[in-house]
Amino acid sequence: MKIVNQEKVKNYILGLIKSGRKDYVKATIDCFNISKSSVYNYVKQMEIDGLIEKNQNTYILKTNTYHYFLKNDGTLGEDRIYNQFISQHIQFKKNVNSIWNYAFTEMMNNAIEHSEADNISVSIYQNCLDTKIFIIDDGIGIFKNIQRFMKESKNETISLRECVSLLFAGKFTTAKQYHTGEGIFFTSHVMDEFIIYSDDNFFTRNNFKSSQVEDGNLHSFMQMEKGTLVSMTISNNSKKILSEVFNTFAPVDEGFIKTTIPVAHMFAGGNPVSRSEARRLLECIVLFNDIVLDFSGVEEIGQGFAHELFVLGKQKYPHIKLRTIKTCKTVEDMIKRVINTSAIQ
């Protein structure tokens, strides 16, 4: 008789409950070939252990919530906030603790030093599978701050949506004398889910779904009149290692030379067509040597965009290596067409 791994069964059930599956009993029976009574015993024990709780006619993961409210009066230090309030809730394996220490202090530093906020709050939503942390400030708003910086430093008037796009590559900062602009980039890559919301605009590398917006915790903060919300989520049992994420994009001997761009997220509508869009993308990536362009969700691109990026861009910036991934046939054909046409001229 096959011995069932009880921890594996439990985690399987928890995953189904988290995803909202109503048929978790049948699915577990089919997956592990165990009886219905055995599944109910697992569920009952998890309820006793405080991992799940009843919600009308089904179960949900039990979430513990903690809130902290801070005055940004010039005395705050992100490390002190983490050690005093946050670390007591982050008691996992060393790799996860390290990720939270890095991510939280990076994002809290942004709120303290760049937001011009009077008040900063931290909310923690924790269940047996994941931990989510919100950092919310009532300041100028991250995208409006970028917009103001571009106007004052370059005399460029850009939309808030364009301000979002400047964050994808990494290295962008409104205070080069103090910061490298790497915090958001690496935090967004090491987290399972990373979202910045401000003034009705989102920055995220994730496949942002309406269900995330409809999440009660996130939606309640979307009603704020000004400021910035940073949402970070990672599995309590994540296998990610912070140093490996850094080494992927910033090898020790070379520095931060690699980046990846989710093209669909970078441009309004997700299907870039113009030369000006390509030029803006090039401006973001020219500081890197190795660039991966992720075309997930992009259904088509314009001839002008493709020519400006893959032909003229390569001529103007010969040091950059452009690699594409997850291209559909339409996009792939357009890229090949402009490159091949250029080669015979």
Regions found by a protein language model. Name each.
Residues 1-105, 114-121, 238-282, 321-345:
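Bergerat-fold GHKL ATPase/HATPase_c domain
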Residues 22-23, 287-292, 318-320:
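Short, surface-exposed connector motifs at secondary-structure boundaries
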Residues 53-67, 112-242:
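Conserved beta-strand-loop-beta-strand hairpin that lines the nucleotide-binding pocket
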Residues 160-163, 183, 277, 305-306, ...:
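Helical mechanochemical/support elements of P-loop NTPase systems and associated helical scaffolds
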Residues 186, 280, 308-309:
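A short acidic, amphipathic alpha-helical/loop segment
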Residues 207, 302-307, 333-335:
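A short acidic (Asp/Glu
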Residues 267, 288-301:
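Short, glycine-/small-residue-enriched flexible loop/hinge segments at domain edges that mediate gating
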Residues 305-316:
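Short, non-transmembrane amphipathic alpha-helical segments
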